[in-house]
């Protein structure tokens, strides 16, 4: 006789249910030259699929300049002005979205996270298949 497995929701599920996040895809493909991202009340999610990137910030607490040399996810949970500097000939491939957190700047999830998370894609096991589906969209 089988018994149903009771699952207890974790604390994060409750927060995400109450403070929803909406993503709006706005770019997929090459970015060449200088691209500045500055949208008030929005976060950003960028996936560098191939190529490399020089990234700059003017905000306190973030590196002025960063070099990203492998496929990576760049997650800005809150508004932070950031600029991509890409070679004009060899455009790096990106998928980019804005993120809108319910509650705006007061969203507890967005406030609890650091201003920037950079995650090389190779560090996340099994992510290749999910990203392949995303990039095919």
Please report, for each region that a protein language model flagged, where it lies by residue.
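N-terminal regulatory/effector-sensing and dimerization cores
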Residues: 24-116, 123-126
């Amino acid at each position: 006789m089988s018994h149903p497995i009771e699952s207890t929701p974790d604390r994060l599920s409750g927060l995400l249910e109450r403070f929803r996040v909406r993503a709006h895809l706005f770019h997929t493909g090459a970015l060449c030259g200088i691209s500045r991202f500055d949208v008030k009340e929005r976060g950003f999610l960028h996936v560098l699929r191939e190529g490399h990137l020089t990234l700059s910030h003017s905000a306190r607490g973030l590196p002025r300049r960063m070099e990203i040399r492998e496929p990576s996810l760049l997650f800005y949970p809150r508004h932070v002005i950031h600029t991509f500097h890409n070679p004009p000939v060899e455009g790096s491939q990106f998928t980019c979205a804005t993120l809108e957190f319910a509650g705006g700047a007061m969203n507890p999830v967005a406030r609890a996270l650091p201003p920037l998370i950079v995650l090389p894609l190779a560090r996340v096991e099994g992510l290749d298949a999910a990203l392949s589906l995303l990039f095919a969209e």
